[in-house]
Amino acid sequence: MPFVVIITGIPGVGKSTITKLALQRTRAKFKLINFGDLMFEEALKLKLVKHRDEMRKLPLEVQRELQMNAAKKIAEMAKNYPILLDTHATIKTPHGYLLGLPYEVIKILNPNFIVIIEATPSEILGRRLRDLKRDRDVETEEQIQRHQDLNRAAAITYAMHSNALIKIIENHEDKGLEEAVNELVKILDLAVKEYA
């Protein structure tokens, strides 16, 4: 039976670090897939874009088609090995927040778990300010908290349409990284019996 874990968190929460460390420790051999990368590869193949930043400017129906194609590929891959899908639950745009995974995509992916990585707004803000290599929007602590709240709401919506379990993992500055990695490993290890 396919085993798909969606992992999400706003920029600066430490999702990439936790994911990388957990994949090194889990007993299951997950395939890590970035949903946006898969969409971008398809768009390049179809000569729709040359750069990733152009993806946001594609017509909505084209973006939806790219999402559907990516979801179908992932569902097919999940028949052979467990998938850890790195994606955004919500995407902040100049006009508001966009759901990262529309209903049709969630139905195809049918995840087992939706994992949200969180930290306090002050921790996230501090990490963003220390990571000057990344081009990130400047947000207040209130805006960061709002984005995390919207991610929780999106995860509930996704779970309603897939029967996935939601797991919130906190990544705090004071020894939180190790605990966060261990919590994710426990979830990933559940896939071992599915692919034995």
Curated annotation (Swiss-Prot):
Is this entry keyworded Kinase?
yes
Report the EC number(s), separated by commas if there are several: 2.7.4.3
Q: Which residues bind ATP?
A: G9, I10, P11, G12, V13, G14, K15, S16, T17
Q: Known Pfam families for this protein? A: AAA_17
Q: Name one GO cellular component term.
A: cytoplasm
Q: Under which main EC class is this enzyme filed? A: transferase
- The main location is cytoplasm
Subcellular localization: Cytoplasm
GO MF terms listed in the record are: adenylate kinase activity; ATP binding
Signal sequence bounds:
none
What SUPFAM superfamilies does its record include?
Answer: P-loop containing nucleoside triphosphate hydrolases
Keyword ATP-binding appears in the UniProt entry: yes
Reactions listed under catalytic activity: AMP + ATP = 2 ADP
Q: Which UniProt keywords apply?
A: ATP-binding, Cytoplasm, Kinase, Nucleotide-binding, Transferase
Which InterPro entries does the record associate with it? Adenylate_kinase_AdkA, P-loop_NTPase
Task: Identify the HAMAP family for this entry.
Answer: Adenylate_kinase_AdkA
- Similarity annotation: Belongs to the archaeal adenylate kinase family.
Know the name of this protein?
A: Adenylate kinase
Naturally occurring in which organism (per UniProt): Pyrococcus horikoshii (strain ATCC 700860 / DSM 12428 / JCM 9974 / NBRC 100139 / OT-3)
- Organismal lineage: Archaea, Methanobacteriati, Methanobacteriota, Thermococci, Thermococcales
The primary gene name is: adkA
